[in-house]
Swiss-Prot record:
<dbReference type="GO" id="GO:0004497">
    <property type="term" value="F:monooxygenase activity"/>
</dbReference>
<comment type="pathway">
    <text>Secondary metabolite biosynthesis; terpenoid biosynthesis.</text>
</comment>
<keyword id="KW-0503">Monooxygenase</keyword>
<dbReference type="GO" id="GO:0019748">
    <property type="term" value="P:secondary metabolic process"/>
</dbReference>
<keyword id="KW-0408">Iron</keyword>
<keyword id="KW-0472">Membrane</keyword>
<dbReference type="GO" id="GO:0016020">
    <property type="term" value="C:membrane"/>
</dbReference>
<dbReference type="GO" id="GO:0020037">
    <property type="term" value="F:heme binding"/>
</dbReference>
<keyword id="KW-0349">Heme</keyword>
<keyword id="KW-0479">Metal-binding</keyword>
<dbReference type="GO" id="GO:0016114">
    <property type="term" value="P:terpenoid biosynthetic process"/>
</dbReference>
<keyword id="KW-1133">Transmembrane helix</keyword>
<dbReference type="InterPro" id="IPR002403">
    <property type="entry name" value="Cyt_P450_E_grp-IV"/>
</dbReference>
<dbReference type="GO" id="GO:0016705">
    <property type="term" value="F:oxidoreductase activity, acting on paired donors, with incorporation or reduction of molecular oxygen"/>
</dbReference>
<dbReference type="InterPro" id="IPR036396">
    <property type="entry name" value="Cyt_P450_sf"/>
</dbReference>
<feature type="transmembrane region" description="Helical">
    <location>
        <begin position="8"/>
        <end position="28"/>
    </location>
</feature>
<protein>
    <recommendedName>
        <fullName>Cytochrome P450 monooxygenase ausI</fullName>
        <ecNumber>1.-.-.-</ecNumber>
    </recommendedName>
</protein>
Length: 517
């Protein structure tokens, strides 16, 4: 592939090598000054001979959970670590309330920093004021207001996707769960993104390309990434996939415009919502649509795979959930009210998110972790101005900081916290004052699965609807159990991310449903 890219021979010239060295030194000095101003301890410094910080960063990737635990054991409130994106601050959950709505601590710049949004080809992750505002408003306002109208179409589309993607035989059949779920979700939700039949496969391909490129680039020192991005095979594949996506989305926009002109009806899709949310400002509709699609795609697939792997080992929970689905559907049909009354299912999803939250992005897993300690990070921000918190902690402009989510594993808050209890939040909802806070879509300082405060995930209500509709269909139509000899864990862990084991195999068989959804 290198013959198609920039000639790399000049990299061997002495002046280029010298420039790289000088750039590296200046970068390290600059990044170091921002956290040393507070005399904050650096947890994983590998010393002066770790010139490009490869040893420190690899330790973070390999042992992030244990490092974070060690950090809070030794330095209760805040400490610094070298990560894939430079030196970051890690703060205790006590800071969550100060972070929740602080105007100078932003989410989008954090995402851009985590996933190379400043580089060509990574526009999906780039923070841009107009697109960021439209992204939030279209999800928080237009999508939320349309959710009731979307329930029935989503139920129909997801049901069809399951019929198309899942086995149709009544005998047991082994499937690679992650692959089937990805294609089910991409097809079942495609109508709000794109009508083109090529969209579901494109979404899967694009998610893989973005994840592979991001992971490959993260293996290089930060100061060299702009250079190596020009010739890394994974990045070149991402560029090609992005070009194909632009062509596909342009074709779909023309089709939707013609369809609306012929029917006179405003369709329920993001292109229409972007127009409303833009208030006349120019914006990149293609990038916005892709950003929203991939932001939801990863989270939806991750949650659904995690819950299905749990259900494959718990037939009693499957029976209880089926009884709830039958009772609720007979009373309410497909509606927002029905989804609200699926309280045990709601609890099961919230408990999966408590035990194994997604955290950050789509890193490619390289280490398999089967045990869980009590520390992880759940909320990330970048300071867009210098920020001074109540205790005097100074966060310099451009500095990224993460809030630990380890209260989700706190025995004082969640008894027997290491144990997965699908009924935990179902019981909590019955306690006085807990009906709202114990719901799947309710972020609190004790449960940061969807973030916290005014910048909590704005699409969580849509995500909850898609997940519940999907699981209703699957519970009614399929039995599930672990595949023979399948002994792998439910999750992969890499750096500060916990991802579903998408390679896990299960056995499924078609069953005769008690009710027709």
């Amino acid at each position: 592939m290198l013959h198609e890219t920039t000639n790399l021979a000049p990299l061997g010239q002495p002046w280029i090598a010298g420039l790289v060295v000088v750039s590296a030194v200046l970068y390290l000095l600059y990044s170091t000054q921002r956290w040393r101003a507070n005399n904050i301890p650096l947890l994983n410094d590998a010393g002066p001979f770790d010139f490009l910080q490869a040893t420190a960063v690899n330790r973070f990737r390999r042992d992030a959970r244990q490092l974070i635990k060690s950090g809070f054991d030794s330095h209760r409130d805040v400490f610094a670590m070298r990560t894939d994106v430079g030196v970051e601050l890690f703060a205790s959950p006590e800071y969550a309330d100060q972070f929740r709505n602080h105007p100078s601590l932003k989410v989008f710049p954090f995402t851009a920093k985590m996933h190379h949004g400043h580089l060509p080809g990574f526009e999906l992750c780039r923070s841009q004021p107009v697109e960021d505002r439209i992204f939030i408003e279209s999800v928080r306002v237009q999508l939320a207001q349309s959710l009731g109208k979307l329930i029935q179409p989503l139920a129909s589309d997801i049901g069809q996707a399951i019929s198309d993607r899942w086995p149709s035989e009544s005998g047991w059949e082994e499937i690679a769960l992650g692959s089937v779920v990805e294609r089910t979700i991409s097809q079942g939700t495609s109508s709000v993104y794109c009508l083109d039949k090529a969209w579901p496969e494109f979404v899967v391909k694009m998610e893989m390309a973005l994840g592979m490129a991001s992971a490959a680039l993260s293996a290089w020192p930060v100061m060299l990434r702009r250079i190596v991005a020009k010739f890394l095979p994974e990045c070149l594949e991402l560029y090609r996939t992005m070009d194909a996506g632009r062509e596909l989305m342009s074709r779909d926009m023309r089709r939707r415009t013609a369809l609306q002109a012929s029917t006179g009806e405003a369709p329920l899709n993001f292109f229409e919502w972007f127009k409303e949310a833009s208030h006349g400002e120019e914006h990149d509709e293609l990038i916005l649509n892709l950003r929203i699609a991939f932001a939801s795609m990863h989270g939806l697939c991750d949650h659904l795979v995690k819950i299905l792997l749990r259900l494959s080992e718990d037939p009693q929970l499957v029976d209880d959930l089926r009884k709830e689905v039958i009772q609720v559907y007979k009373t309410h049909g497909w509606s927002k009210t029905a989804l609200y009354h699926l309280k045990l299912m709601d609890s099961a999803f919230k408990e999966v998110q408590r035990v194994d939250p997604i955290l950050f992005g789509m890193p490619t897993p390289i280490s398999l972790v089967q045990t869980h300690s009590n520390y992880e990070t759940a909320v990330g921000r970048v300071a867009v101005d210098d920020v001074t918190l109540k205790d005097g902690l100074v966060i310099r402009k451009g500095q990224s900081i993460r809030i630990s989510g380890h209260t989700m594993w706190d025995e004082d808050k969640y008894p027997d916290a290491a144990h997965f209890d699908a009924y935990r939040f179902y019981k909590l909802r019955q306690a006085p004052g807990q009906e709202n806070t114990a719901q799947f879509t309710s972020p609190t300082s004790d449960h940061l699965g969807f973030g916290y405060g005014g910048r909590a995930c704005p699409g969580r209500f849509f995500a909850a609807a898609v997940l519940k509709i999907s699981l209703c269909h699957l519970l009614m139509k399929y039995d599930i159990k672990p595949a023979d000899g399948e002994t792998g864990p439910h999750v992969w862990e890499f750096a500060a991310a916990i991802n579903a084991n998408m390679a896990a195999k299960v056995l499924v068989r078609r069953r005769q449903p008690e009710i027709q959804l």
